[in-house]
Structures are given as structure tokens and as C-alpha cells.
Amino acid sequence: SGHPVYTNGDGSQGMLHTGMGATGWGAFAANAYNRSSGVGSVALGFHTMAGKPDVDQNGITGDNIGQFSVGWSVRATGNRAFASGHRTVASGSDAVAMGNWSYATGDSTISLGKENWAEGASTVAIGFKNHAAGGGSVALGQENVSWGTTNFTSGYQNVAGDTSAGVGTAGSATAMGYRTVASGRSSMSANKYTNAINQASTSLGLGTTADNFGMLAVGVNNAAGIGDTTIDPDNYGGYYYSDGQYTGSNPGV
């Protein structure tokens, strides 16, 4: 619950379980205060967990098997999950968490470094305080958020996706550099303080804004398509301006 990025706050990432030792079929536990409850699971180090916290798998099964944990207070509770370091969590199936307080809670996720969260399925969060939320998204660097599906962020304090809506909104967006925002679907922002806030828009340079459908803003403090910024950036209806006047036309008209 004290994680700076993980927001579920449901206590599911704690160390409570039903007993220490090698309690699973063919499991192995060594060192001190460890629990290996999955089939063929391994728990090493100090106060680690490999396998489900509330199930002692006495028979061979394919849904609680092959977990590996090593370090201090790490949890590899997902099926075939791997966790190492300090206070890391690999709770998704085939998840990998390494480092310090990094969480990999989605299936087939990777969380490496410090205080990262790979939330959606097949996400990657590497660095410091990164959050890969939408399925298939990637967050690299420091304090980046990849909110939509298949989003990509790299650098420092960048945001891809529409964080004012549910996880997965404004997919396929890319934000790179320093404090850039790509909140429209299939949008891209790069460099510094740039904002691509509508569908398929691109913003590059310093402090530029691209808020119209498919528009490009480049340079310093330039804006392309200034207009109704409250329009849903995840809707393909779009809008266009001609000579400063709103036309209401669909893209391509």
C-alpha cells in the first residue's frame, strides 16, 4: 500500500501466507523464513515466497508451478513467475520482477529497477517509478506513464495515453523526452514540453502543441490546429479548421 506507483491498495502484495517451508510438490526452500508452495517451486534468501500464498500444492498441476524467488521479502506468486531483489512482486503468470519494490502484476510482464509497475498484460517497465498500464505498453526511464494499450514512453516524466479516462485509453501513442504528453490515439510527442493531444497528431520541439486531428507542430512554442481541446481524443470522428473556422468535417474531407 506504500508503493509510489502501485495504486490498487488492496493489500494483495503483502507477505501473509499459510505457512513457511517447502510445502508444494517437489518444492525446495533454503535459508530462512521462506515458503515454496508451488509445484517444483524454489524459494531462497530471507522471507521470500514462491507459489500461491494460500495454497500448498500437494499434487502436480499446471496452474501453480515453477515459481522462483530469491532475495529479501520478494514474492513470485504467479504461475511460472520469477522474483528477485527486495520487495519485488511477480504475481502475473510468466511475470518477471527484479530490483527494489518493482511489481509485475500482469501476465507475461517484466518490471526491472526500482518502484516500477508493469500492470497490463505483456507490459514492460524498466528504470525508476515507471508505470506500464495498458496491455502491451512499455515505459522506460524515470517516472513515465504508458497508460493506453501498446503505448511507449522513454525519458523523464512523459505520459502516453489519456490518463483522465480508463486504463487502455488512447492506444498506440508515443511520448519521449522530458515532460511530453501524447494523449491522442496514435499520437506522438518528443523532445521537451510538447503535447500531442488529438488523434494521430505529432508534436516536436520545445513547448509545441498539436491538438487537431492528424496535425503536426514543430519548433518552439508553436501550435497546430488550436481549437476545441475538450473533444474526445480517442474518437475517430475528428474535427478540422479552415482559415481559422471550424468546419465539422471528417478526416479526409
Segments (PLM) and residue ranges:
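Periodic small-residue-enriched repeat registers in elongated scaffold domains
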Residues: 1-253
